[in-house]
Amino acid sequence: TPGAPSPPEGLPPDLGAALEVLTAGAAAVLPEGALAERLAAARRAGRPLRVKLGIDPSGAELTLGHAVVLRKLRQFQDLGHLAVLIIGNFTGLVGDPSGRSQTRRQQTEAEVAEHARTYLEQVGRVLDVDAAEVRWNAEWLAPMTFADVARLAAHVTVANLLERDDFRKRYAAGQPISLVEFLYPLMQGMDSVAIRADVEVGGTDQTFNLHVGRDLQRAHGQPGQVVLTMPLLRGTDGVQKMSKSLDNGIYLDEPPEAQYGKLMRIPDQVLGEYLWLTTELDPVEVEALAAQAAGGGAAARDVKRRLAREVVTLYHGPEAARAAEAAFDAGVRQRAGSVTDAASAPPLAIPASAVGDGQVWV
């Protein structure tokens, strides 16, 4: 189960406590010890850390999977650091190839603009957008010349790019990989250079891209950013990464009843990761609930109810969560009543004239 490492010796107690919060649930924080060093250096300099998260507006709705990294960014905000949200209105025209088995359809500028507008509205359910620095990466990527791109491409080799699991699999399978997909990590990396990121947050599928950003910063004379990756949340199928294209998503702007119902239907085996990645429960309580859920049956059902209440409360408030739970329970009783009524119905006599050739004619 995810958890936080012990703070390094010599770190002031308040920074040690902050480090525990910021690393809790993370899949990796690299280089090792770098976040503690950055926290201490920022304290000495009297400035907040610049913590970057990039989002490409690839669809109209954000899921609980998107919220995993958004909530980590909010933790940095709550500790006094500056959240820098990069809206990929330039990279969104290309599409992130991470985790893809084939080339994405390129979006139009109008599609990207509309998706970006709805994204910002939904991001406000998690981040304090007014306190964040919101940037659009066309600001620095659109003016680049072909010569600029050539100089940038010199920092990465094709061999480096083929180390990526998704590219390697596609290459081995003979699936086409466009050159623009190879350039995508460089574009994302330039975002880090442009805003001088101290830390970048992303899912584990972004690990390669985040390290490219770190390398490009150093090539431009900047300190390389700390890379903090979060686990990918599996969807309602309990197998694949949560994604609209796989129809396994739970969306931030869904009605409370829909969120509650979907959470009650997730497979038992993903309950633990949902508790860790979608709630703000204390880690000790999460471990206790995960252990309870491992027993299955009624125990797992009770944990799901707690999970659903917590998540709906986060995005809609406690009253909406109580109403959603009541509506769910009423639906369960209604379905149970329908089954009982059918079982207790009197037998129906079928006349012999309605039976012929092994069939009943109605």
Residue ranges and their predicted role:
Residues G88-G92, G189-S192, E280:
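Short connector loops/turns at beta-strand edges and beta->alpha or beta->beta junctions
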Residues A26, R105-T229, G238:
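Divalent-metal (Mg2+/Mn2+/Ca2+)-assisted nucleotide/phosphate chemistry catalytic cores
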Residues L216-V362:
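Conserved nucleotide- and phosphate/pyrophosphate-binding catalytic cores
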Residues E32-P97, V199-T207, G213:
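N-terminal catalytic cores of NTP/NDP-binding nucleotidyl/phosphoryl-transfer enzymes
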Residues G46-I55, A83, Y184-A194, G235, ...:
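Short, hydrophobic/aliphatic alpha-helical segments
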Residues R74-L127:
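Well-ordered mid-protein domain cores that form the structural environment of catalytic cofactors
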Residues G59-A60, G92-V94, A142-M144, R234-D237:
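Flexible loop/turn segments at secondary-structure boundaries
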Residues P2-R50:
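Positively charged, low-complexity intrinsically disordered leader regions
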